Amino acid sequence: PCVIEAEEKAYAFDMLYVFVGQDFENQNELCGELSFTIAGHEYVTDKTCMILVPKNTPHGPIRVNRVDQPFFTYCGGASKERVPESRDRWVMPEGEFRFEKYVLHGNGEDNNEAEQEVLRLHGSDNKIIGDFGGVFYGKFRWFRVTTPKDFIFAAESHSHGQPELLNFYSTDPDDPYNLGATISMEMMGERYEFDQTTTVFAPANQPHCPLKIMSVERPFMFFTLMPDCKVYSLDK
């Protein structure tokens, strides 16, 4: 198997792991098999999923047991550095261990000819967000080749009370830096245009957008991440 994380580790911040298949007709299929261990319990799945690990919770190894076709994987955490905690600071889950407290499968909404939402973390009513106290806000979606030219995804300039990452990722494993699309986005009123795999960082309270998908030659992954979704705000 392909080993993503060989050893059991824990971190002083919440971690987010995302695994998304590229079968656009069956968005919940990973097209491979994943093994993910949390607090000594192994979870094996062949489905698109998002795994949230609370701070100081030991996890790993993480392995890809099988790949039927390329799939997308991403990890992030609420910290500037990724330094493992010493074992004396590890915290084991209390009570009965249930994977559904940590794993979220495909739950996208609002699919249309332009975009296909696959996963979302949005709002304190989500069982994972409720357990962890609102660690992340995020949406993961594909933009299709059927996206109309000059498709306006976000029409107005706005800001948030939290920093935001806006990520545009290629789906071609042999050409990962070529986005296969052209994007136009404004930051503080200044317009940028790019056609490469790109991460845009919008600091808290900094105006950003409009965001326009100018053209799409092949599907690409777009996802946003912000900390602390319970205080998510949208300020014009």
Model-assigned labels for residue ranges:
Residues 62-112, 211-236:
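Double-stranded beta-helix
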Residues 16-46, 168-195, 233-235:
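A short beta-strand-loop-beta hairpin characteristic of the jelly-roll/cupin
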Residues 41-65, 187-214:
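Conserved metal-binding segment of the jelly-roll/cupin
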Residues 14, 32, 69-70, 163, ...:
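Residues at beta-strand starts and edge strands
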Residues 23-25, 58-60, 80-81, 172-174, ...:
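Short Gly/Pro-enriched loop/turn and capping motifs at secondary-structure junctions
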Residues 1, 16-17, 72-76, 166, ...:
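Intrinsically disordered, low-complexity linker/propeptide segments enriched in Ser/Thr/Gly/Pro
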Residues 1-24, 139-171:
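Conserved short histidine dyad/triad with adjacent acidic residue
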Residues 1-6, 86-155:
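A short, N-terminal "cap"/entry segment at the start of jelly-roll beta-barrel domains
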